[in-house]
A protein has these predicted regions:
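C-terminal cap of thioredoxin/glutaredoxin-like
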Residues: 47, 51, 55-150
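Structural alpha/beta surface segment adjacent to cysteine/selenocysteine redox centers
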Residues: 1-63, 145
């Protein structure tokens, strides 16, 4: 999908998008990894979902790691506070696949066409890498008060 959207110079386009948003970007792996397995592990993390999802995003976009590789998935999950045995248990089967597919369908119905994309308050879509201020404006319009520390 990224190659179709950005053409053969995808790496430069993604880096430019991140630079414009003020986000760090690493050289991405030569092949776009299938992140489904990492996403299932993140879902399994329960209350730590956001923290683990962020770790996987930072690992891929910020450090150029292959988040489709089981060992990378396990290392990042352990660093995010999960235990190795439970992570390998998720990877050994199809646990949480139904949740992932359901959430993916919901995102598509909301208008998401790629990653990164955020759905806020169950319906407001923020597509692409965006500066922090965009999220602040969206939250304010939805009646939320952004945290003082940003």
């Amino acid at each position: 999908m990224l190659l179709a959207r950005y053409g053969p110079d995808m790496q430069a386009a993604v880096k430019r998008m991140f630079d414009e948003a003020g986000l760090p970007a690493a050289d991405l792996p030569p092949r776009v990894p299938n992140s489904r397995r990492a996403q299932r592990v993140a879902i399994s993390a329960g209350e730590r979902f956001g923290q683990l999802y962020r770790r996987y995003s930072e690992a891929y976009f910020g450090r150029g790691r292959d988040i489709g590789d089981d060992e990378v998935i396990v290392e990042e999950a352990i660093a995010g506070g999960l235990d190795e045995e439970s992570v390998r248990g998720v990877l050994a089967g199809d646990a949480y696949l139904d949740v992932l597919l359901s959430e993916t369908q919901r995102a598509i119905e909301t208008g998401a066409t790629g990653v990164p994309a955020w759905i806020i308050d169950g319906g407001v879509l923020v597509p692409g890498a965006q500066p922090h201020e965009v999220f602040e404006r969206v939250l304010e319009r939805l009646g939320h008060t952004p945290a003082a520390d940003g």
